[in-house]
Structures are given as C-alpha cells and as structure tokens.
Amino acid sequence: MAVVKVKPTSPGRRGVVKIVHKHLHKGKPEASLLEPQMQNAGRNNNGHITVRHKGGGHKHHYRVVDFRRNKDGIPAKVERIEYDPNRTAHIALICYADGERSYIIAPRGLEAGQTVLNGAEAPIKAGNTLPIRNIPVGSTIHCVEMMPGKGAQIARSAGTSVTLMAREGIYAQVRLRSGEVRKIHIDCRATIGEVSNEEHNLRQYGKAGAKRWLGIRPTVRGVAMNPVDHPHGGGEGRTGEGQAPVSPWNTLTKGYRTRNNKRTQTFIVSRRKK
C-alpha cells in the first residue's frame, strides 16, 4: 500500500489523498458469490427515512462473505485479494481443498498463495479461525463472534482488532479498540491477526462528489434549518443553538449515553473510554 497525494490541478483535486493498493485483483469478482443489492436510500418499507444522509451512489453487488468459518479441518488456498465496495476492509477469495470457494475478511499481511485453516486444531497464524478457548492469551484477533455459531460481529472493519486479555471459566475477556473490556463465551470463534487496509483512515476525498459516489448525501446543520425541522432552527440572522445540543428528535447529543440494552449489560466488564 502507498499513500499518494494528488497534484492540485483543480479545486476538486486539491487536498486529495489516495491509498494505492497494487496487490488487489483487477478483474471481476467471483460470480457465484454475488447477490443483487437493492438501494433503499435510507428508507424503510413505508418509505420513511430511517437513516438520514443516504441516497444515490454507484450500483454494486453484495459480496457474500463467510463470517462463520465453520468448515473445519479442510485447508483453503488464498486465490486473490479483492476490493469490496460494501465495507472498508478488503476481502480474500479462498478455495477449499474440496473445491468450494468463499470470501473471507482479509487480515493484514495475507497474500495470494497462502493457506488458511478453520477449527480447533488450526495453527496460530494470521487468517486462521479457532475457538477462543484454543487461542493464547494476549493474541491479537478480529472477526470475533458474540454468540457461538452466530458469525463474526466484532472487529470487522479496516484496521481493527481486539486483544484477548484473559480466560475465566466459560468466558474470556477481550479488550476492544474503544477501550471496552467485554466477556465472550470461549466457544465463540475468532480469526488471528488484524483486519487489512489499515491505512483506510488516511484517505482524503477532496470534494463532495466523491462522497456522493459512495451514496452519502450532505449533512445540514440544525441551526441552518427552520424551527419546524429542527430544535436548533429559527432565529433572526445567525444564531446559536440556544440550548443544550440535541438531535432532530430532541434527544441530548454530544456525550449523552443512549444505550438501553440491559440484557447484555452483565457482559461488559469495563465501559469504553470517551
């Protein structure tokens, strides 16, 4: 990977920083692992906006990624590393010894031609997936399950990872990048290593149109709206918020905690750092 600063030949290119990935596959993705993806522009089945600032963007297919990694004992060869428009991380196309192909989240350092393995007997090597009970304490892992057999949910985006801190009984403690320490069942699976594309956060888009290609629409400030549209709206001329910052639905924002999942509260050993 290389970080390239583009020459300022136009206002839209001034300040653009690109991440060049010469190792990525330049052809088409595996057709058998593609699914159509309908664009909903942030609307639900009633047509109501459920996620703001979404719409447009380039059309693309969904790549079916294997987050369970439950095909044990069969070695798989990495055929290539690909770009995935649906996520920040890169994906790897692997082919098992029995001929089955699948996509996995590519860990940092994984290259075409290498071999990955799933199961309790897999060696501790980047890209291999094991139950947490078989992973040494102190290891850096990613694609961690929260429930056995449910599939990876933690540390799936570019450059992320968690650290296995300890094991006590049927639970292990992992420390997330946010600083949160969480209990996870030792039968949950995790993949060794760190997620690829760790320089993703260094990219600078340079112009609004580059974000529109991704399906991201403009974000309008509340103080620039009318009172009917936002609690911060209204006033003569330029005015401030006039109150504690709130969301469009009058919920306190900028630091106010909204987590209300009491069912899994016991699995959090230490809350994340602010």
Swiss-Prot record:
<dbReference type="Pfam" id="PF00181">
    <property type="entry name" value="Ribosomal_L2"/>
</dbReference>
<keyword id="KW-0699">rRNA-binding</keyword>
<dbReference type="GO" id="GO:0003735">
    <property type="term" value="F:structural constituent of ribosome"/>
</dbReference>
<comment type="subunit">
    <text>Part of the 50S ribosomal subunit. Forms a bridge to the 30S subunit in the 70S ribosome.</text>
</comment>
<dbReference type="InterPro" id="IPR022666">
    <property type="entry name" value="Ribosomal_uL2_RNA-bd_dom"/>
</dbReference>
<dbReference type="Pfam" id="PF03947">
    <property type="entry name" value="Ribosomal_L2_C"/>
</dbReference>
<comment type="function">
    <text>One of the primary rRNA binding proteins. Required for association of the 30S and 50S subunits to form the 70S ribosome, for tRNA binding and peptide bond formation. It has been suggested to have peptidyltransferase activity; this is somewhat controversial. Makes several contacts with the 16S rRNA in the 70S ribosome.</text>
</comment>
<dbReference type="GO" id="GO:0016740">
    <property type="term" value="F:transferase activity"/>
</dbReference>
<dbReference type="InterPro" id="IPR012340">
    <property type="entry name" value="NA-bd_OB-fold"/>
</dbReference>
<dbReference type="InterPro" id="IPR008991">
    <property type="entry name" value="Translation_prot_SH3-like_sf"/>
</dbReference>
<dbReference type="GO" id="GO:0019843">
    <property type="term" value="F:rRNA binding"/>
</dbReference>
<protein>
    <recommendedName>
        <fullName>Large ribosomal subunit protein uL2</fullName>
    </recommendedName>
</protein>
<keyword id="KW-0687">Ribonucleoprotein</keyword>
<feature type="region of interest" description="Disordered">
    <location>
        <begin position="224"/>
        <end position="254"/>
    </location>
</feature>
<dbReference type="InterPro" id="IPR014726">
    <property type="entry name" value="Ribosomal_uL2_dom3"/>
</dbReference>
<dbReference type="InterPro" id="IPR014722">
    <property type="entry name" value="Rib_uL2_dom2"/>
</dbReference>
<dbReference type="InterPro" id="IPR005880">
    <property type="entry name" value="Ribosomal_uL2_bac/org-type"/>
</dbReference>
<keyword id="KW-0694">RNA-binding</keyword>
<dbReference type="InterPro" id="IPR022669">
    <property type="entry name" value="Ribosomal_uL2_C"/>
</dbReference>
<dbReference type="GO" id="GO:0015934">
    <property type="term" value="C:large ribosomal subunit"/>
</dbReference>
<dbReference type="InterPro" id="IPR002171">
    <property type="entry name" value="Ribosomal_uL2"/>
</dbReference>
<feature type="compositionally biased region" description="Basic and acidic residues">
    <location>
        <begin position="229"/>
        <end position="239"/>
    </location>
</feature>
<dbReference type="InterPro" id="IPR022671">
    <property type="entry name" value="Ribosomal_uL2_CS"/>
</dbReference>
<comment type="similarity">
    <text>Belongs to the universal ribosomal protein uL2 family.</text>
</comment>
<keyword id="KW-0689">Ribosomal protein</keyword>
<dbReference type="GO" id="GO:0002181">
    <property type="term" value="P:cytoplasmic translation"/>
</dbReference>
